[in-house]
């Protein structure tokens, strides 16, 4: 039977002896567990600050005269038209990635249907030839 030293499976004999104990590390370890960390809570939903709740609501604006409404309506309409024109020009000037990708596969035809058709026609010719010999 081989000696325990020659066996690769066995651990070295030095590993069987326990390492020297470190006393300062144990003392530090005892101090750490005494303080427990609080469990983490799920994030709460955001709510307005308490100071905002106690603030009085803003008074409603005074009614505007008919003339002021007409003037501001024209300004709003002009601003809306400008925004629509800008959006339209942005859309027209954008690259159309989908149209380019859709046109790429169309020019390249797959050779598979052609190969299948040629193979079937050759098999049909061989079948006809065999039937005529009989």
Curated annotation (Swiss-Prot):
<keyword id="KW-0472">Membrane</keyword>
<comment type="function">
    <text>Interacts with Wag31, an important cell shape and cell wall integrity determinant, and facilitates the localization of Wag31 to the cell poles and the cell wall, thus enabling nascent peptidoglycan synthesis.</text>
</comment>
<dbReference type="GO" id="GO:0003677">
    <property type="term" value="F:DNA binding"/>
</dbReference>
<dbReference type="GO" id="GO:0005886">
    <property type="term" value="C:plasma membrane"/>
</dbReference>
<keyword id="KW-0812">Transmembrane</keyword>
<keyword id="KW-0997">Cell inner membrane</keyword>
<feature type="transmembrane region" description="Helical">
    <location>
        <begin position="111"/>
        <end position="128"/>
    </location>
</feature>
<comment type="subunit">
    <text>Homodimer in solution. Is probably able to self-associate in higher oligomers along the DNA molecules. Interacts with the N-terminal region of Wag31.</text>
</comment>
<keyword id="KW-0238">DNA-binding</keyword>
<feature type="compositionally biased region" description="Basic and acidic residues">
    <location>
        <begin position="1"/>
        <end position="10"/>
    </location>
</feature>
<keyword id="KW-1003">Cell membrane</keyword>
<feature type="compositionally biased region" description="Basic residues">
    <location>
        <begin position="23"/>
        <end position="48"/>
    </location>
</feature>
<keyword id="KW-1133">Transmembrane helix</keyword>
<comment type="function">
    <text>Binds DNA in vitro. It has been proposed that Rv3852 plays a role in nucleoid organization and may function as an anchorage to tether the DNA to the membrane. However, it was later shown that it has no influence on nucleoid shape or compaction. It plays no role in virulence and only a minor role in the control of transcription, and does not appear to function as a typical nucleoid-associated protein.</text>
</comment>
<protein>
    <recommendedName>
        <fullName>Histone-like protein Rv3852</fullName>
    </recommendedName>
</protein>
<feature type="region of interest" description="Disordered">
    <location>
        <begin position="1"/>
        <end position="68"/>
    </location>
</feature>
């Amino acid at each position: 039977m081989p000696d325990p030293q020659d066996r690769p499976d066995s651990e070295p004999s030095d590993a069987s002896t326990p390492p020297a104990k470190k006393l300062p590390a144990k003392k530090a370890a005892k101090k750490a567990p005494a303080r427990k960390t609080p469990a983490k809570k799920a994030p709460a939903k955001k709510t307005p600050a308490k100071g905002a709740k106690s603030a009085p609501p803003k008074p409603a604006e005074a009614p505007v005269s008919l003339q002021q409404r007409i003037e501001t309506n024209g300004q709003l309409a002009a601003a809306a038209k400008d925004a629509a024109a800008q959006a339209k020009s942005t859309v027209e000037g954008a690259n159309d990635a989908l149209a380019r990708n859709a046109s790429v596969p169309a020019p390249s035809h797959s050779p598979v249907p052609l190969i299948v058709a040629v193979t079937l026609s050759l098999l049909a010719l061989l079948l006809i030839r065999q039937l005529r010999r009989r």
